[in-house]
Amino acid sequence: VDKPDYRPRPWPRPN
């Protein structure tokens, strides 16, 4: 089974 690529992205934190 091919797993989706889960990569930690630098999401902009909602201040």
From Swiss-Prot:
Antibacterial peptide active against Gram-negative bacteria. Induction: By bacterial infection. One of its GO terms (cellular component) is extracellular region. This is Metalnikowin-2A. Keywords: Antibiotic, Antimicrobial, Immunity, Innate immunity. Signal peptide: none annotated. GO terms for biological process: defense response to Gram-negative bacterium; innate immune response.
